[in-house]
């Protein structure tokens, strides 16, 4: 039976500092925690924190491990956190000529094999949420539970504001100062993913679908993703945008932990 997470946002003067980085750890540049794995012909960079059951963190487009600077200090108290730089981003390798959500999801499935991990909890934000959804279909036995925030499964105006689509199209076709990597990552967002809603019915693991009530991903699209995944849970964060994990980290973290622990 589908469950709806009801969230009441309580503002405090500490909401933006309680999970600030401590001990001057610079995520995505921590030699004590950093590792490389050879997967799918590239060097995939990841950092490991904490102990316990594995939880992999998947960041958004153009981001890095540091995108989860408010999540790692929290979740490392409960899990063995494996935060990954996606292909062609952060410190991970890759080619602008070969980049797709399917390929990135394949990288993460392969990394779990490399680390001899039978199954893991998965938390994905934005593009990382797309990757997590694909993982739940591609290597379903390896995804114990999946939490995604601000994910879309189609790139058209049913999911994104038309103004955003036009901006990406103009950037990809006319920006002469952007790097090949920037063009490739934006082109991927412009034309991918293309996952039929029907395919989501094949997902077997428990899934928490999250979004901000002012997210760039249209609420009706988030709702349709939730409705298409069997036994999924839904959480819409109030007064929140696409970056709710950074905007309201305390609330976000506790919500995800509650889902993982239930």
Residue ranges and their predicted role:
Residues 203, 209-211:
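Short beta-strand/loop motif that positions the catalytic acidic residue
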Residues 240-249:
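Catalytic histidine-centered segment of alpha/beta-hydrolase-like enzymes
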Residues 4-55, 79, 261-262:
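Alpha/beta-hydrolase fold catalytic core
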Residues 118-156:
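Conserved hydrolase catalytic core segment
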Residues 83-123:
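Active-site loop/oxyanion-hole signature of alpha/beta-hydrolase fold enzymes
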Residues 213-240:
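Conserved loop-alpha-helix segment in the C-terminal half of the alpha/beta-hydrolase fold
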Residues 184-199:
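Active-site nucleophile elbow and catalytic-triad environment of alpha/beta-hydrolase enzymes
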């Amino acid at each position: 039976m589908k469950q709806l997470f009801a969230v009441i946002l309580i503002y405090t003067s500490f909401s933006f500092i309680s999970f600030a980085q401590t001990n001057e750890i610079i995520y995505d540049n921590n030699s004590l925690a950093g590792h490389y794995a050879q997967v799918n012909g590239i060097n995939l960079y990841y950092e490991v924190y904490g102990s316990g059951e594995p939880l992999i963190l998947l960041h958004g487009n153009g981001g890095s491990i540091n995108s989860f600077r408010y999540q790692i200090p929290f979740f490392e108290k409960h899990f063995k956190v494996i935060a990954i730089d996606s292909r062609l981003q952060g410190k991970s390798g890759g080619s602008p000529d070969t980049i797709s959500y399917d390929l990135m999801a394949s990288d993460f499935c392969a990394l779990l094999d490399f680390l001899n991990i039978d199954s893991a909890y998965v938390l994905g934000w934005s593009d990382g949420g797309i990757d997590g959804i694909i993982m739940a279909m591609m290597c379903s036995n390896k995804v114990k539970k999946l939490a995604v925030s601000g994910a879309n499964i189609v790139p058209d105006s049913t999911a994104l504001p038309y103004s955003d689509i036009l901006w990406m199209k103009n950037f990809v076709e006319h920006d002469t100062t952007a790097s090949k990597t920037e063009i490739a990552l934006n082109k991927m967002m412009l034309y991918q993913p293309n996952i039929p809603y029907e395919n989501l019915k094949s997902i077997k693991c428990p899934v928490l679908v999250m979004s901000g009530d002012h997210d760039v991903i249209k609420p009706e699209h988030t709702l349709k993703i939730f409705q298409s995944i069997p036994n999924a849970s839904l959480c819409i964060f109030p007064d929140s945008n696409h970056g709710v994990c950074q905007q309201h980290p305390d609330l976000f973290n506790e919500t995800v932990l509650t889902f993982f622990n239930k």
